[in-house]
């Protein structure tokens, strides 16, 4: 389990319900949990040479310092703006990027069964992974398609100078 620390303190936000009263205090969520699960033991410990020989992805993209930081069970990452993204519950692309780099190789395929605004697809593309996304809400399908297309355009456009 990874604890995503979204904010430190209340940052001026107020949890209405019974402000400054014991009648009905509402807790303000400053963290969320990311559950890491696998069927059986999570083990992709085939040697690089065996993976390469069998045509399987084998290249890591994670920096050693990032690996050490990201294998801690708390990640402090600022939340994403719902208004800016256009989705009521967006998360920053940094969250799936870290998970993708920790648990997959370059060239692997990432599955996102709840695509929402497309953050995981964008993170997968930026880290050299393939992705498959699913979303039931047609509005979010259109949003994700637009955001992925914009990310592809930015990804393919060389920086000036």
Labelled PLM ranges:
Residues 1-143:
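Core catalytic lobe of class I
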């Amino acid at each position: 389990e990874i604890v995503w620390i979204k904010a430190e303190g209340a940052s001026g936000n107020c949890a209405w319900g019974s402000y400054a009263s014991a009648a009905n205090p509402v807790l303000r969520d400053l963290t969320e949990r990311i559950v890491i699960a696998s069927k059986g033991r999570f083990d992709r410990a085939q040697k690089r040479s065996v993976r390469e020989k069998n045509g399987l992805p084998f290249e890591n993209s994670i920096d050693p310092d990032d690996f050490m930081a990201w294998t801690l069970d708390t990640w402090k990452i600022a939340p994403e703006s719902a208004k800016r993204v256009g989705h009521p519950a967006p998360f920053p692309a940094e969250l799936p990027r870290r998970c993708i780099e920790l648990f997959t190789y370059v060239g692997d395929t990432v599955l996102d069964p709840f695509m929402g605004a497309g953050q995981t697809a964008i993170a997968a593309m930026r880290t050299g992974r393939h992705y498959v996304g699913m979303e039931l809400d047609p509005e979010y399908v259109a949003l994700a398609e637009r955001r992925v297309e914009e990310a592809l355009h930015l990804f393919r456009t060389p920086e000036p100078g």
